[in-house]
Regions:
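C-terminal/domain-edge helix-coil "capping" segments
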Residues: 3-25, 30-37, 127-131, 153-156, ...
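Generic short beta-strand segments
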Residues: 29, 140-146
Length: 238
């Protein structure tokens, strides 16, 4: 059986203290725009067109020593909307948190964010100051490929997204949760295959499973029962 890479990766800044956050605003998640070329990061949060290695699907961004072919997959806006709602729903279920949903949060910046291509940290600062919250949750959907075929035999679905917790006072990314999974067949991922009912699931189901896994690792609003934070990474939070 093949080796299955981690489906969830977590990073936390040394300054992150979950106990200091009792209110959150959730911004609508962004999507990868295609076709795009990679560009440098802004303010600690990667631009939507930047694709990291773990979020490349088979056959994309492969280097053979002389050629470097880039193929991009279209991520539908409906996928970002669905994942945003799922994240907001999980957070709203934590009684100790005051959560402001994506509609009210986005109304603070509205069309201005699209017209000026406003970076996420800047949006978070404006939203946080206006709504008077301790943190702003934002995200990026990098991959959303639907299953082709039936549950019993198919080209599997693939979903990849990131969740950011941003400090409104200065736009710093305090916590990042990343999820990517292209469902594997039984002989490559026994646990994962039966976790999904013993068949190939849709992208919507895979996304819901991913949100649950990432948010299980999100310690805000869980008190002392929250998951331990990972050791701070010496590199800049992406």
């Amino acid at each position: 059986m093949g080796c299955v890479p981690p489906k969830v990766q977590i990073e936390a800044a040394p300054q992150f203290d979950p106990s200091r956050i009792s209110s959150l605003a959730v911004l609508p998640f962004q999507t990868i725009k295609t076709p795009q070329l990679a560009s440098s990061s802004r303010g600690g949060v990667r631009d939507p067109e930047e694709i990291r290695t773990q979020f490349r699907l088979p056959g994309t961004d492969q280097a053979d020593g002389t050629e470097f072919k880039k193929v991009r997959y279209v991520v539908p806006e409906t996928a970002a909307h669905r994942i945003t709602k799922q994240v907001a729903s999980v957070l709203s279920g934590r009684p100790s948190l005051r959560v402001i949903g994506p509609e009210e949060s986005f109304s603070v910046v509205g069309e201005e964010s699209s017209e000026k291509e406003m970076a996420l940290p800047v949006m978070a600062q404006k939203v946080g100051a206006h709504l008077k919250v301790d943190g702003v949750v934002a995200g990026l959907v990098r991959t959303y490929r639907e299953r082709e075929g039936s549950k019993l035999g198919a080209k599997p679905a693939a979903v990849g997204f990131e969740v950011y917790l941003i400090r409104p006072s200065d736009g710093m990314v305090l916590w990042t949760g990343e999820f990517f999974e292209e469902q594997k067949p039984l002989n490559q991922d026994v646990v994962g295959f039966f976790e999904k009912g013993g068949g190939f699931v849709t992208a919507a189901t895979l996304a819901e499973l991913g949100v649950n896994k990432v948010m299980k690792a999100f310690p805000v609003g869980l008190g002392e029962q929250g998951p331990p934070l990972p050791a701070p990474s010496p590199k800049e939070i992406p």
